[in-house]
A protein has these predicted regions:
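A structural preference for short, pocket-lining loop segments at secondary-structure junctions
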Residues: 40-42, 55-97, 104-123, 145-149, ...
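Alpha-helix capping and helix-loop boundary segments enriched in small/acidic/polar residues
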Residues: 49, 90-104, 123-130, 156-160, ...
Length: 334
């Protein structure tokens, strides 16, 4: 039958990889140097669940960045998020410091990626959810396969995005609307509901895919060559990393409105008590319980995400949700 021949302009990384030695490799991920001194981060754990080892490779790429970084893999799903088995073990051991430390490392990894002095291109396909999507959100540009499903789904297991997902969604909605109150409400709603876009075009309604910046591609085998070309294009144009976003967390009656929305949902039988606990934890990241809004830095929002995550991890309801998903494959409503 001979070797598989792919059309011009198409590359399948699983074929390219056979001729390459990784710069760094562990059980979860590998870092490669491709032609023209571009780095490629490949996740390859089970279901591409993210662990500390995955993030170690992300940080290594940000340091040894060459002329650009591409985050891409050939698996059916880019990454469905952080490894929940690891979290459940930490919760059962009541190792809150361990959870906090994991989130600190995760945050520092996505920040290092975003602040790298070279272009960072994410080229996902399939499920790109939770922590997997948080990595994509910190890239300069997304070149996504048309089947990519994007979203922050953490609330379904009783936690909040803890790697900049809330922060980044909030910034994007503010860029789109120029209104912090609207940005806070939209972020709260879609993170609270764990909404996903089942294609790049549908993800655009959540600001998860930015049509004016990002690209959707029908042929999966073109993702890598397009990403490599984009690194060249950005470098030729004189690349500089984006500066940190300055935030405002709106005050007034916004938190009360959010609480009332949840209470009505519970009364109508749409929500369960723990849904409100989780929703108000998200609210606490993007709003302030004071008459006026307050300025906030990106680092403060990261810290609020992390605190909210750890506080929820301490609740028996969240432990039950994570256990239900891992042990029965069902999303527990409690």
């Amino acid at each position: 039958s001979g070797p598989v021949k792919l059309p011009e302009g198409t590359i399948r990384f699983s074929m390219t990889r056979r001729c390459l030695d990784p710069i760094l490799r562990n059980n979860a991920a590998s870092l490669y140097a491709l032609e023209r001194d571009v780095r490629l981060i490949e996740f390859h754990s089970k279901a591409n669940a993210l662990t500390d080892e995955s993030m170690e490779v992300v940080r290594a790429a940000a340091e040894d960045h060459g002329r650009g970084i591409v985050v891409h893999n050939d698996a059916q799903h880019f990454s469905a998020g952080v490894d929940l088995n690891g979290f459940l073990s930490l919760i059962r051991a009541k190792d809150w410091g361990g959870i906090d430390a994991f989130l600190v490392r995760f945050e520092s990894s996505v920040k290092a990626l975003r602040d790298a002095p070279v272009p960072v291109i994410a080229a996902p396909s399939g499920l790109t959810l939770g922590g997997g999507f948080e990595i994509v959100m910190h890239a300069d540009k997304v070149i996504a396969h048309a089947n990519t499903v994007m979203g922050l789904v953490e609330t379904s297991v009783g936690v909040v995005p803890g790697g900049g997902g809330v922060k980044e969604t909030f910034a994007r909605w503010h860029r789109a609307t120029g209104d912090w109150r609207k940005a806070a409400w939209n972020t709260w709603m879609q993170v609270g509901y764990g909404q996903t876009g089942t294609s790049p075009e549908l993800s655009a309604r959540y600001q998860y895919f930015l049509p004016e910046r990002d690209q959707s591609v029908m042929n999966r085998d073109k993702l890598l060559s397009l990403a490599l070309a984009e690194v060249d294009r950005m470098n030729d144009a004189g690349y500089a990393p984006a500066s940190a976003y300055e935030f405002e967390r709106p005050g007034g009656d916004l938190q009360e409105e959010m609480a009332a929305f949840m209470d009505k949902g519970i009364a109508d039988g749409l929500f369960f008590p723990h849904d409100k606990t989780v929703a108000m934890a998200v609210a606490g990241i993007v709003t302030e319980a004071s008459p006026v809004g307050v300025a906030a830095t990106e680092d403060e929002l990261f810290e609020r995400e992390r605190r909210a995550f750890v506080a929820l991890a301490k609740t028996p309801e969240t432990e039950a949700r994570i256990a239900s998903l891992l042990e029965n494959g069902t999303v527990l409503r409690n």
